[in-house]
Each structure stands twice: as structure tokens, then as C-alpha cells.
Amino acid sequence: MAKAGSAGGPSPGGGAPWHLRNVLSDSVESSDDEFFDAREEVAEGKNAILIGMSQWSSNDLVEQIETIGKLDERQGDGATACTSSILQEKQRELYRVSLRRQRFPAQGSIEIHEDGEEGCSQRSCKTHVLLLVLHGGNVLDTGSGDPSCKAADIHTFSSVLEKVMRAHFPAALGHILIKFVPCPAICSEAFSLVSNLNPYSHDEGCLGTSQDHVPLAALPLLAISSPQYQDAVATVIERANHIYGEFLKSSDGIGFNGQVCLIGDCVGGLLAFDAICYSAGPSGDSPGSSSRKGSISSTQDTPVVVEEDCSLASSKRLSKSNVDVSSGVEDEDPKRPLPRKQSDSSTYDCEAITQHHAFLSSIHSSVLKDEAEAPAAGTPQLSEVSLGRFDFDVSDFFLFGSPLGLVLAMRRTVLPGIDGFQMRPACSQVYSFFHCADPSASRLEPLLEPKFHLVPPVSVPRYQRFPLGDGQSLLLADALHTHSPLFLEGSSRGSPPLLDAPASPPQAPRFQRTERRLSKGSSHSDSSESSDSLAPMGASRITAKWWGTKRIDYALYCPDVLTAFPTVALPHLFHASYWESTDVVAFILRQVMRYESASVKESTGLDPTALSPANPREKWLRKRTQVKLRNVTANHRANDVIAAEDGPQVLVGRFMYGPLDMVALTGEKVDILVMTEPSSGRWVHLDTEITNNSGRITYNVPRPRRLGVGVYPVKMVVRGDQTCAMSYLTVLPRGMECVVFSIDGSFAASVSIMGSDPKVRPGAVDVVRHWQDLGYMILYITGRPDMQKQRVVSWLSQHNFPQGMIFFSDGLVHDPLRQKAIFLRNLMQECFIKITAAYGSTKDISVYSVLGLPASQIFIVGRSTKKYQTQCQFLSEGYAAHLAALEASHRSRPKKNNSRMILRKGSFGLHAQPEFLRKRNHLRRTMSVQQPDPPAANPKPERAQSQPESDKDHERPLPALSWARGPPKFESVP
């Protein structure tokens, strides 16, 4: 690694340590796009010149103006005059280059210059990440279905993304936007053809056997071999550019300069990969095109791709679309590369067809010889074919169950000159998600390095247990260190590689290989040192051809029950699961928000041990703990706390394992974190406590660190296994008005002895939201034990109840009604709250009467009885009539207390662990392989969502003491 530079001599710095060599290399070889990851929300044109003058020297400004003049003259002297739009693009690109040199701070810390209001208005783009979802369906889609089915998948994905962001990534709310790019169903003709070829196609009675006989892996291979495939790629590029252009014109995209990520499903991933590769070609390059390609560094948390920028501009071997392949056509030297044409980046598939026809002619020469020679004779015409290119820079590329590995393996077989390095797409990182049982998916890493077939793919952490990641390293350097015996240079000679990649790719420029090695060393201080055990040449050979700095293959959780499903049903099932998977969404958010997570870990007052994914776990303090917690799941809970503005703030949590609190976590560390600024999403570490013999911790917030009026999320994280308990701390001013709801008495329309999911009374959610809209604080109270908190909160979240404070009994109590009365009385006396209205059943009348509430403020759901007729208001006609009465009359009014307390209007998030919502059937997609029903054209308002759902989920009860509902998600509890 000491040899670098264009001449192959010693690198600057000689034998200096690796980090000094990187600093010297950056200072010598830095390009204009080195600081592309800095924020670019600045004005262009005249304002850009003024800002540039204040931040840069006037000589550079003169050079830019002269350069623009030279470009204009050069274009005027050529055969074709440069249009005004092209010249304006060149001017804007030069301005961008000068502005990048200003080295603006990272996102979130940009300073406002003296430009004031004008500059601020031009920096106000709220979208930081644009996710373009290329949806082409699975390999069995016929393409004749309803287009709204694809839109339904995107809607599902968007809703899951929003819920996960609200629960664990609140800083990303409003800054990530999803756009849908429909892709043609390129496998439909291949599926029709193969279906007619199977031995059972003549027998309609054996339809199931006929479908199972379809070779699913052959469908994408046939699809990409079709001459129409090139048109499909061009269509995708055109649609993506159109949608991106419309986005820039919209209110969400004006001034956008963030990162653009691509998400491709089974078919869309194939088209997206080739579209990225075509976009990396040299055709149509402008002087600013090198910065375009270099823009992928804006989303990379390491400088690897920044250093690649110059190589991206100068090397034409970054993708399969512009690779020198050995010709198989007769009358040509097979060792001589094909002559490069001016626009060969847009004619790769035409050359591939030529090669493929020549390959077939060796087998069927009498039939295909003329066809194989015809394209070769018409080669000059092929150079005129143009597929276009993306108008944006691709940062991260996510694949959902794509057979890209099979396609690239076939291309490597037909065109032996292609290897993994030359097929590298122009993006900073590729992530390939798949289920191990998915017949459509395949791995990519063994194509880039054959020895990786012995390395298992990265297991995506389960969102239910590790919403912020489980701490496993995704860096390639760490994987090379962990499996270093596999990648030693001597050991790799024994097995025949899938790709005949040399020890150092001769096609790549020398400086590009050097920068790849240096960037690998500087990507992570630990990983660079950990890979020292691997031979430097072996490590550089692998990293030089890798598609980023992290692992590529990621395996999702796959239930064993899927092995019993018919093979033909699996593509539809797995394809639907990606859009519903919280595991996938959380993983994507962790990758695209790396700048935010880095700033969180570096901020003062934060606990890096509890939040850093690089070191999330510690050893248990007691050796017995690991044995006690084997084969049991966490059932932690922390009580919601209400405190007066000038009173003590005491946080209480209990850490138990097992559904019935069979095991208590005793004598172990628990980190206490609070989100002091909920809008920022940053967790502040308060302290670390040790659990007592009953698994409890009680923490009194010190007076200097007490929080002001507001609602603050609280998280208590177990150091040993990173399980956590979520709650809220609410600090109220004196005289805060509240509305109390008894969960079982006022919301549940059915009583289940076996504990299955209770029905919700129609209109209950609307009444609660009515009081919330008026500014009242919502108090949910129940006599159930606190061990059921996760189940109850999940039930409230499933039915879209508004956010509020929830209170349970402390364990199993003999008289829960008495506990309710004591608790509410303490709130009124110690926190000085005022109860404006109280809802419940007839059992709760005594509780509310003891508190001194008049009959006009007690609302009981159910039939009127003479015994209690004078003590309460009966809602015999249901919540709908009651809500109409509240809105029509003046029985409900806005709260009168201090306006300093502004409550967040919303519903319960996903901090309630979704595994408590699981029920009997985890695979809600049917085997009929139908897409989900599209969303209604006029969706119901949010209030209408409170109507009870179908009773189809109430057929089979769960064990006792469980409130559960099976959401339409694919995942199941491991």
C-alpha cells in the first residue's frame, strides 16, 4: 500500500502512517468535488458569484469567466454550435464547483450569511433524500394487471417508512420523499413462452403442477437477452428523468441538492442497474460531468468515492456499459479488444447482441450465421443508438430480491472479458436484500470475489429487537479481517474463481487502484487496522472491484414455514413482503441518515455507548444473567410520568423477561435517555442505573437537569442486550385540563375471556381526537397489570388512537378500581391537574364520583340504568351521537389553562413492539398471487379510520392476558 501515484513510485509521505498518507494524498490529489457532501443549498447566477467572491479569491472568479468564454468559442468553432441551454448548464456547473470550494459545513449546521432573507429563501428545500422506487414487479408478473397495484405497494412502503421514522428517526420526518417510477414487465413474454414449454402445459387439470414446473431462474435471463430489453432500459431512464424533473419543479424539490437513492425490486432492480451503468458512460459528458459522477460522495460516510471522482471522469471501465470485451466474432483476433466508438456507452447491448449472436452461431452456424454477421457489418449504425442518461446522481442503490447475480453471471459466461470491477455501477454503495428461500434472488458478492461464497450474507437486524441496529459492522474491511484465512493470496489459488480477475486489474488506471486502497484504509480507523492481517495486495484486489465500502448481500428473516409453500407462490409473497418490512425500512433509514447519526454520537451530553451501533453491547455484570435470559423475550416497561412544573421528576422502569414476568433482570446496567428536543430526534443520556432484585430502577432527575414544560420521550436501554423500554415524561403547568378515558370501560366493545383482540366501539377514536383537538391532555387509565403495557399500547396504536399518557396497575392487584381512584387523586393533588370529562363503564362511576366530578362530566357508555341515572351521563346512542352533541352544543370548549403547554397532535407510534400484535397467520398475502387492493381514489379522512375492522381476525383466540391483532405484515417473531 506504500506504492501509489501515476508513476508507480512511492506515495507522498513515504513510510508515514496510513492516516498521514491519506491526509497527504488528499492535499495533493483532491478534486473539485472533494467537498460535494457539503451542503449546496445556495443561490446560483449572480448571487452565486457574490457569495463566491466573499468566500473565494477574485482570481478564481476571473478564471471561471474566462473559462466560460473559451467554452463558448470552442463550441462555436465546432461542427455543431452549442445551444444556450448547454452553455447555461456549463456555467451553472462552474458555479457549483466554485461554491463547493467554500467548504460549507455538513447538513444541519449551515450558517446563514448576511444575505439574509433572500439567501434563506433559496436554501429552504426541506427534502434531503429522494427515494426513487423503480417498481417492475416480480418475474411472474404479466404486465397486464392494474397499474394501481404498483401504487398500492408504494403506498404501503411509504406508510411503513413514516411510522418507523416517527418512532425512531423523528429527525428525518419531512426530509425524505418517495417517488414512484413504473417499469415495464420485461419478464412477461418469457414467462408466457416458458409456460408453454413445460411438459404439463397441455393438461389443464394439472395447473398447479404445470406452474411449479416453470424454471423461475430462467425468466430474467431470457428477458435481458431480448433486443427489446435495451428499449426498456431507455424507457426507465426517460421516466426517471421526467419524474425527477417534475420533482424539481414542485414545492418539495425547489432548491434540492440532497442525495438521490434508487430502490429496485425484482425486475426494477435489473433495469435500474443497467440504467446506472449507462448513465456512467462518457457520451454527452460536459465539463461538469465529472462532478456529476463524483456526487456519490455526498452520501458516503467515508472518503472512498470522493477519491474515486477523478477516476470516474477519466476511466471508461466503471460499468458493463463501457467495457472492453474480447470479441468472439470470426475474422478478428480474440485477444484484441473491440475498437471503442465515441458513444459505446449507449451501444453496449447492441455489441452484446453481436457477441451473443456470434456465440450462438458456433452452435447453430447454419441458421444464425447470417444474423450473427449482420450486426457486425452494421456496427457504425449501432453507435447512433442513444439510451440517454440519468439527470441526477445516484448515491445508494437498494435491490429487493433481484436476480441481478444470475444476469451478470450469464453475461460473464457469454462475454468472458467482463469482470466484477468493470461492471461497477456509478453509485457509492449497492445493497442487495433477499430472503434465502426466494427462488428469484441471488447473491452478488461471489461474483466480485469467488471466496465470498463461503462467507454468509449479512443478516438484517430485526426491527422489533434492534430498531437502531445490532452493532454488527457492515464494512468490507471488517469482513476481510474476520475471514482473513479465506482471502489470503495463497489460499485463493486452489479453487477456480467464478471471475478470472487478476491479482490487480490491469484494465484499471493505476491511480484508481491506489485511491481505492487508500480510501479503504481511511474509511474506518478500526477497520483499516483490522485488515492488516490480510495481505495488502489481496485486500486491494478485492476492494478495487467492490461496489462501495460495505457488504453487498443482506439476508432478511425468512420463516421456516415458507418451505411448505408452492414455489410459484413465493415470488409474489416475497415481493409483497419487501414493501411491508420494517426491517428493510429501518435498515435503509440507518444508511441514508448516516450524517445525522454521526452528529448525534458526537454531540455533547449524549451517551455514545448506548447509541453507537459500532459498540452496542456490553458483557453482563452477572454470569447467571445470560443463562437466565436464554429462550425468553423481553417484556420491559416504563411508566408514563406526569410531573408538575416545579415538582420532582421520577422515572420508573421494570425489566422483565417472558410473557408472565418469569425472569427479572437483576443487577444489570440500564442507560436512561431522554429526548430533550423531540423535533431534533436526539437522545440525551441522563444516567446509568443498576436494576434491583425485582428488575426495577427508580431515577430521580437531578434538579439542574430537570426538564421544562412539555412532553419528552424516555428510553431505558439494557446494556447487555440493547432491549429497551419506552415511555413519556410530561411536565405540566398548574391547572392543566385533562380528559380521562378508561380503556376497557369506554373503548372495548367486546369482552374476551381468552384475551383475543377486543373490538373498538364505533366513533371512540373520533371522540378522543375531538378532545385532543381542543387542547386537552388525554389520560388513558386501566386496571390491567403493567405487564400488559406493550399489548395495550400496540392495540391503541393499531386502532389509531390519539397520543396520550397511559397508566396501569402495579402488577396484579385485588381492587383495581381503588387503585384507579388513588392514582387519579394523586395526580390532582400533586400535579394540580383538572379533570374536565371522564369516560368509562358503570364500574368507573364510583371512581369518578370519589374524585368529586359532577354528573355532567362523567360519561358512561352503555344502556341507562335507574341506579346510576343521576350520577352520570349515559351515552346510550353511542359515540357518534355523542360527538355530534359535543360539536353542536357548547358542552366542550377549548382548554383555558396556560398556553405554554402545547400538546403534539398525533397517534401512537411504533415504540410499542409490533411482535405483540402478531396473530395466527403471519402471511396475509394469499397464494392466489394477487396484488393488494389499490387505495381508494378518495381516501377516508383520518377520523373515519376509527371504525371497527372486520371480524375475520377474531376466529382463533390467543393465550390468556393477550391483547393482540395481526397486522397485514409479512414478518413474524423469530
Curated annotation (Swiss-Prot):
GO terms for molecular function: calcium ion binding; lipid binding; phospholipid transporter activity; receptor tyrosine kinase binding. Residues 310-347, 497-535, 927-974 are annotated as: Disordered. The modification Phosphoserine is found at S30, S31, S109, S295, S298, S321, S343, S495, S612, S907, S928, S946. GO terms for cellular component: cell body; cell projection; endomembrane system; membrane. Residues 520-533 have a biased composition (Low complexity). Gene3D superfamilies: HAD superfamily/HAD-like. Its main location: membrane. It is found in: Endomembrane system. Keywords: Calcium, Lipid-binding, Membrane, Metal-binding, Phosphoprotein. The keyword Ion transport does not apply. The keyword Phosphoprotein applies. It comes from the Eukaryota. Belongs to the PtdIns transfer protein family. PI transfer class IIA subfamily. Interacts with PTK2B via its C-terminus. This is Membrane-associated phosphatidylinositol transfer protein 3. It comes from Mus musculus.
